[in-house]
Structure formats: structure tokens, C-alpha cells
């Protein structure tokens, strides 16, 4: 008789039912983490064109990649939450759900009659997560928000860029949106753990603004200590040197020395040991005070060889160093493949799940995002009110 190895569970949240009322990016990113980790996620979309991001490019055929990344593996149903029949289906979902996630502007769920207090009456174990631009409380609670607005109002744009340049959005990604999604996931996971002990649900209130402030870290600490907002410093580190982009003979690369020992090792390997004993550079506070002169001295030595040479020898000397890669080069790194961070979903490549948990599969292929109302008929039947059944 041939023994078969039992299949691994889908993820630690296998069996969890998530009702997903979120749209665009900050909420869907949080619920996608739950989905990747095994939860069954039902995305409720409004009549018409559904989630706005279905109309966002880039496209592969008629498929929005923007929408696909943060909705892969979910089910879609169109419900009009002002229609009595659809409201009944929604409430039946709530009765059976573990988690409800929403990112409407504060007040919308109240007007629909679906705030936490009302839904907790029919499901006291419900974890109800709200993610908004500025939170459910405070003078800016009802202020409309997109990623760039939150970056501007959090101070991060004023702290980003070069001293002689304008305030700069953290580009290449929607940082504030993703902060909201990550902290929504953290709140949901924490509340689920607490529910195991208390048997009770909870209301989670997270915001893009709060998350971005938390990520500001050293900038807020600098202001707290000095009373002054930190100046823009380009690619340098606010407290350590050398910690910057440096020009080699052919192209730039990055060197990061977090202590005096690493700085001495760097000076030795690039053939400039005298820099380690130069009074301007002996200790970190000296190097910080003379950062411009330090960079000039290092780049003089680095100009003698191409970046590939320095990346090799500096790395072998134990000093943190790295190449400057574009997105295509990063995607093609063997490390990216080794970590399964480019996966196939719905026939297209996209970022994988960065959370690796022993005992659970991390599949290279995941289900794609649903078409609008793709599972609508089946879900209406599954969650029909008892009297309708």
C-alpha cells in the first residue's frame, strides 16, 4: 500500500472568512496578506465598474495589474448596500464572518447602518477593521486622502530629497497606502489572537497618516530632541558616515559603514588606510561633521577601479556594500527567485508573499484576481437569508 503525504494546509488563516469592503490600495493590500496566508476573502464591490482600480493600468489584455496584485485569490460579488435584498445577503455574510475590513471615509458605514456596534450585535466575535486616511477620530478624520496627500501632510516629503532640491514623494511605491494595509493586517492578526482568549471581537482603527508617522522614525526623533525638523540629506544617513552612494570609475554603488571598525576595514581595502587616522574621520561624529570631505576622499580612491571590482573586494572585507539596481535587475536576481518573491497569478508575474512560515506552502502560482461579480451567483445562494432559502 502506498502511503501519501498529507497536503499542507493553505496557511495559518485557513478556515478564516473575511468580508472585504475595501477598495483601491491601502485596505486591499492588508486583506491580500490574509488571503495569501490562507483566509477565504469575499470582496464586495459596488454596482457598475466595481473597485476603481479595475480601471487602472497597466493592463495585460483586459486585466488591470494594479487591481490583480491586491485582489489575487479573492472572490467577487456585487452588492448594493442600499438595496434591502442585498443588505440581507451582506448581513448573512456578517453572521458567519470572522473578519470585516473596510476603508471608506469615516461616517459611511454609520450611514449605511453597518458600524461596528450594530454588526457586533449579530456577531459578537466579529473582528471589524477600519483603515482610513487619518483615522476615525480627530479633526482630520473626514479629510479625503490619497497616498501623496498623506505623504505631504505627514512630513515625509519635506524630509525626502536633496538639500538643494524640492520636497520629494517617496517614489516607486505608495508608501502611505501600504502602511495602512500592513498595520490593518497587524491589527487583525492581534485581534484574532485576543479573541482566542476572550471570545470577543473588536474594532480596529488604523490610518495611513498614523502608519506613515510611525515609519518616519528618526525624523520625528530628531525633531523631538532638537525642536527642529530634519533637513533633507539625499541618500546619506542622518547619524552614520560613510553611508551613501559613491561614484566608482564607471558607475555609482552603495557603501554603508555603521561603526569605526567597518570604516577602517573600508579604508584598508580601497588602498587609502590614511583616511582612518585622519583627524577629520577617526570617529563617527568626526565623519558626520566632515561628510562632504569624506565623500570626496573616498571617491578619489574609488575612481581607480570599476564598481564591479569594488563590490567584490569590499564585500570580501566584510563591509556592507551593494550595487544600484533597477527594478528589472532586482527582479532577475537569483535571490529573488530563491525567496519566491516573483510568482505567477492569473497568468502574470507579480510580487510574492514576503511572510514565510514553516509548515505551510509558499506556492509559486496563486489564483488570479476575480472578474467583477465572478462568484456572485454562488455567493448569493450560499449566503441567502434563511427565509429566502
Curated annotation (Swiss-Prot):
The keyword Lipid biosynthesis does not apply. The active site is at 237. Keywords: Transferase. Its EC number is 2.8.3.19. GO terms for molecular function: acetyl-CoA:oxalate CoA-transferase. InterPro entries: CoA-transferase_III_domain, CoA-Trfase_fam_III, CoA-Trfase_III_dom3_sf, CoA-Trfase_III_dom_1_sf. It comes from the Bacteria. It is an enzyme of class 2 (transferase). The keyword Cytoplasm does not apply. Coiled coil: none annotated. It catalyses: oxalate + acetyl-CoA = oxalyl-CoA + acetate. SUPFAM superfamilies: CoA-transferase family III (CaiB/BaiF) (SSF89796). Involved in the catabolism of oxalate and in the adapatation to low pH. ACOCT serves to prime the oxalate-induced acid tolerance response (ATR) cycle by producing substrate for oxalyl-CoA decarboxylase (OXC) and formyl-coenzyme A transferase (FCOCT). Catalyzes the reversible conversion of acetyl-CoA and oxalate to oxalyl-CoA and acetate. It can also use formyl-CoA and oxalate to produce oxalyl-CoA and formate with significantly reduced specific activity. Homodimer. Belongs to the CoA-transferase III family. This is Acetyl-CoA:oxalate CoA-transferase.
Amino acid at each position: 500500500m502506498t502511503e501519501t503525504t498529507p497536503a499542507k494546509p493553505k496557511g495559518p488563516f485557513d478556515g478564516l472568512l473575511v468580508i472585504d469592503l475595501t477598495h483601491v490600495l491601502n485596505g486591499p493590500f492588508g486583506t491580500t496578506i490574509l488571503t495569501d496566508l490562507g483566509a477565504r476573502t469575499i470582496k464586495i464591490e459596488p454596482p457598475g465598474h466595481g473597485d476603481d482600480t479595475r480601471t487602472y493600468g497597466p493592463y495585460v489584455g483586459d486585466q488591470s495589474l494594479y487591481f490583480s496584485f491586491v485582489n489575487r485569490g479573492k472572490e467577487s460579488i456585487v452588492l448594493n448596500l442600499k438595496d434591502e435584498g442585498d443588505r440581507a445577503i451582506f448581513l448573512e455574510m456578517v453572521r458567519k464572518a470572522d473578519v470585516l475590513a473596510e476603508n471608506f471615509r469615516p461616517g459611511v458605514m454609520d450611514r449605511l447602518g453597518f458600524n461596528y456596534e450594530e454588526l457586533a450585535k449579530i456577531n459578537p466575535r466579529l473582528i471589524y477593521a477600519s483603515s482610513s486616511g487619518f483615522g476615525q477620530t480627530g479633526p482630520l478624520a473626514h479629510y479625503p486622502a490619497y497616498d501623496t496627500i498623506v505623504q505631504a501632510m505627514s512630513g515625509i516629503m519635506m524630509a525626502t530629497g536633496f538639500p538643494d532640491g524640492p520636497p520629494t514623494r517617496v517614489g516607486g511605491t505608495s508608501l502611505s497606502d501600504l502602511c495602512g494595509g500592513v498595520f490593518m493586517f497587524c491589527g487583525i492578526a492581534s485581534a484574532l489572537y485576543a479573541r482566542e482568549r476572550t471570545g470577543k471581537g473588536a474594532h480596529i482603527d488604523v490610518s495611513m497618516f498614523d502608519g506613515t508617522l510611525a515609519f518616519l522614525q528618526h525624523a520625528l526623533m530628531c525633531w523631538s530632541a532638537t525642536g527642529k525638523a530634519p533637513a533633507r540629506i539625499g541618500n546619506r544617513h542622518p547619524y552614520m558616515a560613510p553611508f551613501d552612494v559613491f561614484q566608482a570609475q564607471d558607475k555609482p554603488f552603495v557603501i554603508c559603514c555603521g561603526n569605526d571598525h567597518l570604516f577602517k576595514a573600508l579604508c584598508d581595502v580601497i588602498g587609502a588606510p590614511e583616511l582612518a587616522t585622519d583627524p577629520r574621520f577617526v570617529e563617527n561624529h568626526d565623519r558626520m561633521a566632515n561628510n562632504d570631505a569624506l565623500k570626496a576622499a573616498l571617491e578619489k580612491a574609488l575612481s581607480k577601479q570599476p564598481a564591479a571590482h569594488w563590490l567584490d573586494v569590499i564585500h570580501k572585507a566584510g563591509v556592507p556594500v551593494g550595487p544600484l539596481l533597477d527594478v528589472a535587475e532586482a527582479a532577475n536576481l537569483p535571490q529573488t527567485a530563491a525567496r519566491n518573491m516573483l510568482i505567477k497569478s492569473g497568468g502574470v508575474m507579480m510580487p510574492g508573499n514576503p511572510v514565510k512560515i514553516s509548515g505551510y506552502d509558499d506556492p509559486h502560482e496563486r489564483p488570479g484576481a476575480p472578474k467583477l461579480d465572478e462568484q456572485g451567483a454562488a455567493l448569493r445562494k450560499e449566503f441567502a437569508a434563511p427565509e429566502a432559502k
